[in-house]
Amino acid sequence: METGPHYNYYKNRELSIVLAPFSGGQGKLGVEKGPKYMLKHGLQTSIEDLGWSTELEPSMDEAQFVGKLKMEKDSTTGGSSVMIDGVKAKRADLVGEATKLVYNSVSKVVQANRFPLTLGGDHSIAIGTVSAVLDKYPDAGLLWIDAHADINTIESTPSGNLHGCPVSFLMGLNKDVPHCPESLKWVPGNLSPKKIAYIGLRDVDAGEKKILKDLGIAAFSMYHVDKYGINAVIEMAMKAVHPETNGEGPIMCSYDVDGVDPLYIPATGTPVRGGLTLREGLFLVERLAESGNLIALDVVECNPDLAIHDIHVSNTISAGCAIARCALGETLL
């Protein structure tokens, strides 16, 4: 039975769960298990209970990529890493291959007028999801929920882990960089700095701060959440990406679960204390659902292998599923 908010762009309420079990954008295995765990938790059935018809859309062979990653770790040559001024763009070939597969899957979904719910995997997979959504909705705004800005270029990245760089690829900031990995030159790079807003930031590298300021990107840190409250921040973010229409227009949400405080979501790769409460994190997507303008959602960076106790797995996976359900119409009353 259909319940809750209406979706202006998906009145047929058809949805595809795109599985993106990729961990190569960072160095910790286990995050590729996120989609499997969320499905095991009953996510697909609970979405159907909200009135959506669903289908699964696998984007890649999980075992194949895990095998490639393990082979690369055993390699003495560094595998597909690219050296740039002494810093590695780590696993660049695998990131390029995986994100193109995700792009192909999400493109198929959105061109069929189905809502793409993409389950990661690390946040590098957003290179594929956002690029595909922008093909269909070039005026879409992007809300990036994260403790981190993920806008390092391959020149500024301190770690070389490409899950910290997807926004720079989406904006085309690496196109003129010497030695830009060939595997990622397929990325259109057409996201405008005026079409993205961040919520939840609290661990931003110095180079990223400069990029955010130089490009005038709307960035709401936890300071802003504390100062204004989560509802006001969401309203400001929506208006930032659609200023001409007072916040009305298609919006994609790419949600890294580390945006929420690790007290609530502990099993994630780069936890940072002082984040959103679980209720704030859920209210955020409830408000997006209420707007009627949500067109796509990523839920990424759930890593069950990093749990210290079983309850940490349960808390993390249940929270990831709750984010998806609330974005898709679940309400408290």
From Swiss-Prot:
Induction: By arginine or homoarginine. Mn(2+) 1 binds at residues 123, 146, 150, 256. The modification N-acetylmethionine is found at residue 1. Pathway: Nitrogen metabolism; urea cycle; L-ornithine and urea from L-arginine: step 1/1. It catalyses: L-arginine + H2O = urea + L-ornithine. Present with 42800 molecules/cell in log phase SD medium. This is Arginase. The lineage of its organism: Eukaryota, Fungi, Dikarya, Ascomycota, Saccharomycotina. The gene is CAR1.
